[in-house]
């Protein structure tokens, strides 16, 4: 069956510094090289959507949502505990089957260049690919995929690796650029796809911070995790949260993340 999706990225004329990236963190990024690109597309059907089979990949690291629900992250980490100096020989694709409802299907993807973990491995440039077969209530199937009809933007709220600042401008949406000479050779991953599970810290609890007050809360986990931080907060004004992470037997903190 003919491939439906095309590799897309930010427009190369408007974003010349956010095209290429190091193949691994062993190769330092150039100034202006870091980028959190976002891609979106809405599909409206006559009949209700029942389910979707999705094939998706991104370079270097991607996160996919459908109808505001988390689908997955990837690609499966092909690297190891070493620094790569050559582009990744194969780029793995993730495959998902998800249930749907309603006549509207919305995709949103975030793709980061360069990688930030030692096992992240790249072809040396940013890209995103998705194709899906959507089953409708009348029994018909619609095949869709990424192309120049998707929208793209560089989200300025991610100014640096591991930093998110809601106060910054997310940036305008613009037509995605369809990459004319893709460098990726997609292969089904021979290892399990990445997965998310919610892990509560030991002794997790709610707490209240008064206006103008600063509080420091320390929590521990039962072991080391590769994780992202999820916070639930109700605020009545500006609020800055700084989280730092360290191993229990180390005195120095890892880089901070501003939320």
Whereabouts are the PLM-identified features?
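Extracellular/oxidizing-compartment recognition motifs
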Residues: 1-259
């Amino acid at each position: 069956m003919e491939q439906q999706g095309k590799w897309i990225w930010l427009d190369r004329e408007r974003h010349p510094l956010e095209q290429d990236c190091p193949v691994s963190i062993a190769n330092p990024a150039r100034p202006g090289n870091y980028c959190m690109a976002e891609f979106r597309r809405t599909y409206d059907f006559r009949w209700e959507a029942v389910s979707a089979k999705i094939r998706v990949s991104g370079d270097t690291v991607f996160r996919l949502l459908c109808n505001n629900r988390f689908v997955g992250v990837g690609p499966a980490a092909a690297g190891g505990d070493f620094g790569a100096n050559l582009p990744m020989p194969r780029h793995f694709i993730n495959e998902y089957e998800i249930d749907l409802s309603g006549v509207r299907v919305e995709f949103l993807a975030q793709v980061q260049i360069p990688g930030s973990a030692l096992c992240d491995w790249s072809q040396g440039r940013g890209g995103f690919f998705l194709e899906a077969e959507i089953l409708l209530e009348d029994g018909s199937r619609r095949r869709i995929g990424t192309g120049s009809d998707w929208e793209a933007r560089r989200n300025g709220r991610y100014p640096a690796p591991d930093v998110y600042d809601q106060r910054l401008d997310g940036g305008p949406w613009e037509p995605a650029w369809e990459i004319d000479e893709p460098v990726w050779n997609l292969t089904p991953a021979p290892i399990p796809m990445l997965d998310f599970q919610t892990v509560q810290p030991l002794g997790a609890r709610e707490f209240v911070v008064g206006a103008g007050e600063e509080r420091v809360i320390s929590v521990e986990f039962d072991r080391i995790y590769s994780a992202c931080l999820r916070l639930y907060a109700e605020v009545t004004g500006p609020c800055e949260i700084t989280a730092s992470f360290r191993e229990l037997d180390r005195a120095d903190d890892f880089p901070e993340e501003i939320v």
